[in-house]
Amino acid sequence: MPAPILLTPGPLTTSATTRHAMQHDWGSWDAAFNQLTASVCADLVAIAHGGDEYVCVPMQGSGTFSVEAALGTLVPRDGVVLVPDNGAYCARILKILGRLGIDAIALPFGEDAAVDAAAVEAAFAREPRITHVALVHLETSAGILNPLDAIAAACRRHGKRLIVDAMSSFGALPIALADSGIDALISASGKCLEGVPGMGFAIVRRDALDASEGNSPSLALDLHDQYAYLRKTGQWRFTPPTHVIAALRAALDQYLAEGGQPARGARYADNCRTLVESMRALGFVPFLDASVQAPVIVTFHAPDHPAYDFRRFYDAVRGAGFILYPGKLTRLETFRVGCIGAIDAGDIRRAVAAIGAAVESLGIAMQPA
């Protein structure tokens, strides 16, 4: 039986070429593997348009490991971090800062509202002690896109440092670090680059990284030490996820051959457009307004029907070969459908047909939205 298609924001469906790259074993101290790491890091900085101002620090583990590493390394103990909060991944940053003992100020927004740059500036006026902003660029709990450029500009005007969780946007949406004033951008292998999970990375401004020595309370999650060792030896400090990096190298080769960010973003946008139009034809209503919807994952209102049960619905769609994501909102019954991975609009149309059949199997009659 073929593997199901993952309609999730990561892990996601990968190409056969990417999976095949993991068939080779690598020595973690071998020169060939060191060259592999260096080539991956160079491409990641180039994709971010970082130029010579920025370096890539790879980190073992999920993307959250790298988010915690960046916060723990780049924010000094007496720093104060403003966290615009419009979803679960913003809340996770607040939890990380709490565990690190770093003072944090939450700036709440609705789950269906993008962060407002003017509200961020107003927070600077109310709380002049703020030193940093930690922004989730694409809040995947709903699929909402936050205005990175406007917030980066506000931070520059007020002399605040900006750390960006670009976990679900990097590689698909345009981001240019050069002259942005952003201290760090964090993402991971298993998202829009279409690698496999297991490696995060921070693309960090050199001067911010140089100034961070001794900040981190963690040995393993110290970005400064990780990069210093990598620069000195070409090696990771601790055992690297060798097969993950090999898969990412293959995924990056395919990414560049496809046409880089513009082409990857266009394919995902086509997937998203096809998904929303086809789901509306079935009767499903997107949670977000189109003006703030990112082309990565779409949240839909669940059917308002007593026969609806997410587990039975999920199992029926899973049986047809597609894996969905549960909702992650606090106040509404929803589910999510991803638009990313090694998939195209044809896969999306087949998935929507499976969703329609699943709803029908539950005895739910829907009308076009």
Curated annotation (Swiss-Prot):
<keyword id="KW-0663">Pyridoxal phosphate</keyword>
<keyword id="KW-0670">Pyruvate</keyword>
<dbReference type="GO" id="GO:0047304">
    <property type="term" value="F:2-aminoethylphosphonate-pyruvate transaminase activity"/>
</dbReference>
<keyword id="KW-0032">Aminotransferase</keyword>
<dbReference type="InterPro" id="IPR015422">
    <property type="entry name" value="PyrdxlP-dep_Trfase_small"/>
</dbReference>
<dbReference type="Pfam" id="PF00266">
    <property type="entry name" value="Aminotran_5"/>
</dbReference>
<comment type="function">
    <text>Involved in phosphonate degradation.</text>
</comment>
<comment type="subunit">
    <text>Homodimer.</text>
</comment>
<dbReference type="GO" id="GO:0019700">
    <property type="term" value="P:organic phosphonate catabolic process"/>
</dbReference>
<dbReference type="InterPro" id="IPR012703">
    <property type="entry name" value="NH2EtPonate_pyrv_transaminase"/>
</dbReference>
<keyword id="KW-0808">Transferase</keyword>
<dbReference type="InterPro" id="IPR015424">
    <property type="entry name" value="PyrdxlP-dep_Trfase"/>
</dbReference>
<dbReference type="InterPro" id="IPR000192">
    <property type="entry name" value="Aminotrans_V_dom"/>
</dbReference>
<feature type="modified residue" description="N6-(pyridoxal phosphate)lysine">
    <location>
        <position position="191"/>
    </location>
</feature>
<dbReference type="InterPro" id="IPR015421">
    <property type="entry name" value="PyrdxlP-dep_Trfase_major"/>
</dbReference>
<dbReference type="InterPro" id="IPR024169">
    <property type="entry name" value="SP_NH2Trfase/AEP_transaminase"/>
</dbReference>
<comment type="similarity">
    <text>Belongs to the class-V pyridoxal-phosphate-dependent aminotransferase family. PhnW subfamily.</text>
</comment>
<protein>
    <recommendedName>
        <fullName>2-aminoethylphosphonate--pyruvate transaminase</fullName>
        <ecNumber>2.6.1.37</ecNumber>
    </recommendedName>
</protein>
